[in-house]
Protein backbone atom coordinates (compact mmCIF):
# COMPACT_ATOMS: atom_id res chain seq x y z
CA UNK A 1 0.00 0.00 0.00
CA UNK A 2 1.31 3.39 -1.00
CA UNK A 3 1.36 5.88 1.88
CA UNK A 4 0.17 9.35 1.00
CA UNK A 5 1.00 12.87 2.13
CA UNK A 6 -2.27 13.77 3.84
CA UNK A 7 -5.60 12.23 4.76
CA UNK A 8 -7.25 14.22 1.96
CA UNK A 9 -5.15 12.20 -0.52
CA UNK A 10 -7.07 9.06 0.51
CA UNK A 11 -10.61 8.13 -0.40
CA UNK A 12 -12.56 6.87 2.58
CA UNK A 13 -12.32 3.32 1.18
CA UNK A 14 -8.53 3.59 0.79
CA UNK A 15 -8.13 4.87 4.34
CA UNK A 16 -10.37 2.09 5.64
CA UNK A 17 -8.04 -0.44 3.98
CA UNK A 18 -5.07 1.31 5.63
CA UNK A 19 -6.76 1.02 9.05
CA UNK A 20 -7.62 -2.63 8.42
CA UNK A 21 -3.97 -3.32 7.61
CA UNK A 22 -2.97 -1.80 10.96
CA UNK A 23 -5.65 -3.77 12.83
CA UNK A 24 -4.49 -7.03 11.22
CA UNK A 25 -0.83 -6.22 12.02
CA UNK A 26 0.21 -7.10 8.47
CA UNK A 27 3.67 -5.57 8.58
CA UNK A 28 6.62 -7.85 7.89
CA UNK A 29 8.08 -6.85 11.26
CA UNK A 30 6.86 -5.21 14.44
CA UNK A 31 8.74 -2.08 13.41
CA UNK A 32 6.80 -2.01 10.12
CA UNK A 33 3.56 -2.18 12.12
CA UNK A 34 4.80 0.60 14.41
CA UNK A 35 5.59 2.78 11.37
CA UNK A 36 2.02 2.34 10.11
CA UNK A 37 0.63 3.34 13.51
CA UNK A 38 2.83 6.45 13.59
CA UNK A 39 1.65 7.29 10.07
CA UNK A 40 -1.96 6.82 11.22
CA UNK A 41 -1.36 9.29 14.06
CA UNK A 42 0.24 11.81 11.70
CA UNK A 43 -2.51 11.56 9.10
CA UNK A 44 -5.49 11.69 11.45
CA UNK A 45 -4.20 14.45 13.76
CA UNK A 46 -6.71 13.09 16.30
CA UNK A 47 -5.77 13.84 19.94
CA UNK A 48 -6.41 10.21 20.95
CA UNK A 49 -3.86 8.96 18.41
CA UNK A 50 -3.39 5.19 18.45
CA UNK A 51 -5.86 4.86 21.33
CA UNK A 52 -8.52 5.06 18.60
CA UNK A 53 -7.27 1.63 17.50
CA UNK A 54 -6.20 -0.02 20.73
CA UNK A 55 -8.44 1.56 23.40
CA UNK A 56 -11.71 2.61 21.74
CA UNK A 57 -14.36 4.49 23.66
CA UNK A 58 -17.22 2.35 24.99
CA UNK A 59 -19.76 4.22 22.86
CA UNK A 60 -17.99 3.54 19.57
CA UNK A 61 -18.05 0.48 17.34
CA UNK A 62 -14.79 -1.42 17.93
CA UNK A 63 -13.92 -2.05 14.29
CA UNK A 64 -11.93 -0.44 11.47
CA UNK A 65 -15.21 1.06 10.24
CA UNK A 66 -15.88 2.55 13.68
CA UNK A 67 -12.38 4.02 13.78
CA UNK A 68 -12.78 5.67 10.38
CA UNK A 69 -16.23 6.99 11.31
CA UNK A 70 -14.86 8.60 14.47
CA UNK A 71 -11.95 10.18 12.58
CA UNK A 72 -14.27 11.49 9.87
CA UNK A 73 -16.65 13.03 12.42
CA UNK A 74 -13.84 14.54 14.52
CA UNK A 75 -12.11 16.08 11.49
CA UNK A 76 -15.38 17.62 10.27
CA UNK A 77 -16.18 19.01 13.73
CA UNK A 78 -12.70 20.56 13.96
CA UNK A 79 -12.59 22.18 10.51
CA UNK A 80 -10.01 19.77 9.11
CA UNK A 81 -10.00 18.40 5.58
CA UNK A 82 -11.86 15.21 4.83
CA UNK A 83 -11.29 12.29 2.53
CA UNK A 84 -10.80 12.64 -1.21
CA UNK A 85 -14.02 12.14 -3.16
CA UNK A 86 -14.08 9.24 -5.55
UniProtKB/Swiss-Prot annotation:
Pfam families: Colicin_Pyocin
Keywords: Bacteriocin immunity, Plasmid
Keyword Chloroplast found: no
Species whose genome carries this gene: Escherichia coli
Official protein name in the record: Colicin-E2 immunity protein
Cross-referenced SUPFAM superfamilies: Colicin E immunity proteins (SSF47345)
Family of the protein in this entry: Belongs to the colicins ColE2/ColE8/ColE9 and pyocins S1/S2 family.
InterPro entries recorded: Colicin_E_sf, Colicin_pyocin
GO biological-process terms attached to the record: bacteriocin immunity
Molecular function terms from GO: toxic substance binding
Entry keyword Ion transport: no
Function as written in the Swiss-Prot or TrEMBL entry: This protein is able to protect a cell, which harbors the plasmid ColE2 encoding colicin E2, against colicin E2.
